[in-house]
Amino acid sequence: MAASENPRDRAVQHMFNRIARRYDLLNRVISFRLDNRWREQAIQSIWTADNPLILDLGAGTGDLTFSALKTAGGGRIVGLDFSLEMLRLAQRRSRSVPHGEQSRFVLGSGLRSPFRDAVFDGVMSAFVLRNVSDLALFFDQAFRVLRPGGKFVSLDMFPPSKGLFAGFYGLYFYHVVPWIGALLAHDRAAYQYLSESVRTFHSPVMVAEILKQAGFAHITWRRFLCGAVCMHVAERPNPSGIPA
């Protein structure tokens, strides 16, 4: 399946294919090993049914998927990603992690989700939004595949609030991280892109507004690490009032 007709999307797809094998290690280094804790909190916010069917948008190597299965035990998760190399690693990991058999992975784009309407109890995404060329369309698709009453949760990185930490973060993320990428992944350009994607991304308030425009309700967000990471939670309204 072609990644996208958008040149930016194709470039991002090729970049993630290049860095797939080192991506998880670099996430740990870049986040000071806090990313797993943030994922657990995202999972807790969305796991509202006993045996839910969850979509992991931009699943990558399966970090969020496997964290959810380990944390919650029950449920089934479908991971969607447009990087073939990432999904190959996810599929391989699924054979050796707890409850890995409750996951499956699909090659495709979150901008053209291949799933039917209102099929998932929840949709989750971690560190994906900044890499999406059309965030409004991405949220529209997430809304479409959610059942009424289902929740959407996303984690992503943002420029932190002003202050001493913001200065340290700017030095670390915009200057040190590309060097770490060059050292560990042998791809400085990829991590230069990731740094720039944070610098130029929407504010958390704007992300919440785009979620609202897509039809979501009960939108909240929570800041971690002085605002360097935010978790947005939103719900597809359920006009009938019947639980999803």
Regions found by a protein language model. Give the residues of each.
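Core SAM-dependent methyltransferase catalytic element
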Residues: 208, 214-244
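Conserved alpha-helix/loop element of class I SAM-dependent methyltransferases that forms part
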Residues: 32-51, 67
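Hydrophobic beta-strand segment of the Class I
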Residues: 23, 123-124
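C-terminal alpha-helical "lid/dimerization" subdomain adjacent to the S-adenosyl-L-methionine
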Residues: 155-210, 214, 220
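A short acidic, Gly/Pro-enriched loop at the edge of an enzyme's catalytic core
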Residues: 111-122
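Class I SAM-dependent methyltransferase SAM/SAH-binding core
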Residues: 53-113
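A short glycine-rich, Lys/Arg-flanked "PGG" loop and its adjoining helix->strand segment in the class I
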Residues: 136-148
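N-terminal, positively charged/glycine-rich alpha-helical extensions of SAM-dependent methyltransferases
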Residues: 1-22, 173, 184
